[in-house]
Amino acid sequence: MPPTPCSLCHTARALVKRPKTGQQVCKDCFFEVFETEVHNTIVEGEGIFKRGERVAIGASGGKDSTVLAHVLSVLNKRYDYGLDLYLLSIDEGITGYRDDSLETVKQNQAEYGLPLKILSYSELYGWTMDKIVEQVGKKNNCTFCGVFRRQALDRGAAQLGVDHIVTGHNADDIAETVLMNIMRGDIARLARCTAVTTQSEDTIKRSKPFKYAYEKEIVMYAYFKKLTYFSTECIYSPDAYRGHARVFLKDLEAVRPSAIVDIIHSGESFVLEQSVQRGMKALQTCLRCGYISSNDLCKACALLEGLESGLSRSALRQTQESTSAAPEGHRTIPMFERYASLNGTPRTPPTPAEPVEGIERAA
């Protein structure tokens, strides 16, 4: 039986069957169509980026962030986006997992020639995830990690003076999030979880260029490009709630390959009614650390106070309503500062030529 020709160039032998479309394509055409689809996501509408932006790539060393760093470096040159790219990594303090994956990030730094900033939970919160799990157990540890990681990314970006954070969240991740928000009845998050770009009044802009990129295609891209990435799953994630949504999504995909993007499009159709929006809490800044919050105390400060006090999970919720200073002797989070304040007063970020504390420059 003769080899199947590429359905795009009709000359080379097809090596890849795209999970998203069913197209059988050669390696070079796969690279081109994958990169072009990411570019189309970037430039759709008003576009994700603005020329001259300083952009931090959330780098974990995994397949998604590794491919994102590679593809953004390629597209930035090919289409002349005019971006200053950085790698920003968060060290959660998970022995045997994050310490190994950060070595992969450092290899990526050398390969792509991008400056790297690493910020740890230990230096920011005084806790590592290993210590947190010792205290709270594995059942609820993802709550702590998610809250701490999101704020750590914003704080690392502020230290770099960047305008924008991009993450490697792919189509599978976003479809899982839609399903999770439906199962939890989380209307507010359901209405915004499919957006390519999100930004609150005083948070740094975040974007997901891989919104429509299937996880399987990201893996194939990394494989055929021979990219170095860390493939071990977090040792604390098997019990995460997201895992149930992931299993359900894979079952749907097996029956209907377009299920992933279909769920994303369904999520895009959800819009909050004005009456619901008016009932939501207004955003303000945390009285302790200055980070954006819908309560007087942000989630990170509330969780940290609970850890420092040895509180149970039910008691942790009560700390979010606290307006008092942290108890004496408790560790607290440094004040959050960024380059555009809540009242609109601009603050000048460091220019690319200025050294930024804690940054590792590519050789």
Curated annotation (Swiss-Prot):
EC number in record: 2.7.7.-
SUPFAM superfamilies in UniProt: Adenine nucleotide alpha hydrolases-like (SSF52402)
Example of a GO cellular component annotation carried by this entry: cytosolic tRNA wobble base thiouridylase complex
Group of enzyme by EC: transferase
Signal peptide annotation: none
Region (Disordered): 340-363
Presence of the UniProt keyword Cell inner membrane in the record: no
Pfam families per UniProt: ATP_bind_3, zn-ribbon_14
Subcellular location: Cytoplasm
CDD domains: CTU1-like
Pathway: tRNA modification; 5-methoxycarbonylmethyl-2-thiouridine-tRNA biosynthesis
InterPro entries from the UniProt entry: CTU1-like_ATP-bd, CTU1_C, Ncs6/Tuc1/Ctu1, Rossmann-like_a/b/a_fold, TilS/TtcA_N, tRNA_thiolation_TtcA_Ctu1
GO terms of molecular function: nucleotidyltransferase activity; tRNA binding; tRNA-uridine 2-sulfurtransferase activity
Keywords: Cytoplasm, RNA-binding, Transferase, tRNA processing, tRNA-binding
GO terms under biological process: protein urmylation; tRNA thio-modification; tRNA wobble position uridine thiolation; tRNA wobble uridine modification
Stated role: Plays a central role in 2-thiolation of mcm(5)S(2)U at tRNA wobble positions of tRNA(Lys), tRNA(Glu) and tRNA(Gln). Directly binds tRNAs and probably acts by catalyzing adenylation of tRNAs, an intermediate required for 2-thiolation. It is unclear whether it acts as a sulfurtransferase that transfers sulfur from thiocarboxylated URM1 onto the uridine of tRNAs at wobble position. Prior mcm(5) tRNA modification by the elongator complex is required for 2-thiolation. May also be involved in protein urmylation.
Family: Belongs to the TtcA family. CTU1/NCS6/ATPBD3 subfamily.
Name of the protein described by the UniProt record: Cytoplasmic tRNA 2-thiolation protein 1
Organism of this sequence: Cryptococcus neoformans var. neoformans serotype D (strain B-3501A) (Filobasidiella neoformans)
Gene: NCS6
